[in-house]
Amino acid sequence: MNKNELVSAVAEKAGLTKADAASAVDAVFETVQSELKNGGDIRLAGFGSFSVSRREASKGRNPSTGAEVDIPARNVPKFSAGKGLKDAVNS
């Protein structure tokens, strides 16, 4: 499912126009990004948690030349599925 399909599904299930559903979906995505960028996390009971994890600097190799390269430290987003989502997927 891509973003347009998600917007259509939200519009249908919530009885919204596609424009209103698109605004709602965009608002959710922007809020998640903003909260994670500011170092926060988002916990949705029964669905899962979004958080940021720090990945330390490391050494890697260029696959075509074999030369060693430095990979800088960075923040990476993480999602951990909640019990409700896991149960729904496995039922």
UniProtKB/Swiss-Prot annotation:
Q: Does this entry carry the keyword DNA-binding?
A: yes
Span of the signal peptide: none
According to its UniProt entry, the protein's GO biological process terms are: chromosome condensation
From which domain of life does this come? Bacteria
CDD domains per record: HU
**GO CC terms in record:** cytosol
The alphabetized UniProt keywords are:
DNA condensation, DNA-binding
Q: Name one Pfam family in it.
A: Bac_DNA_binding
GO terms for MF: DNA binding; structural constituent of chromatin
- Check the record and name the Gene3D superfamilies matching this protein: IHF-like DNA-binding proteins
| SMART domains, alphabetized | BHL
List the InterPro entries hit by this protein, alphabetically. Hist_DNA-bd (IPR000119), Histone-like_DNA-bd_CS (IPR020816), IHF-like_DNA-bd_dom_sf (IPR010992)
Function per UniProt: Histone-like DNA-binding protein which is capable of wrapping DNA to stabilize it, and thus to prevent its denaturation under extreme environmental conditions.
Please state which protein family the record places this protein in: Belongs to the bacterial histone-like protein family.
Q: What is this protein called?
A: DNA-binding protein HRL18
Q: Which organism is it from?
A: Rhizobium leguminosarum
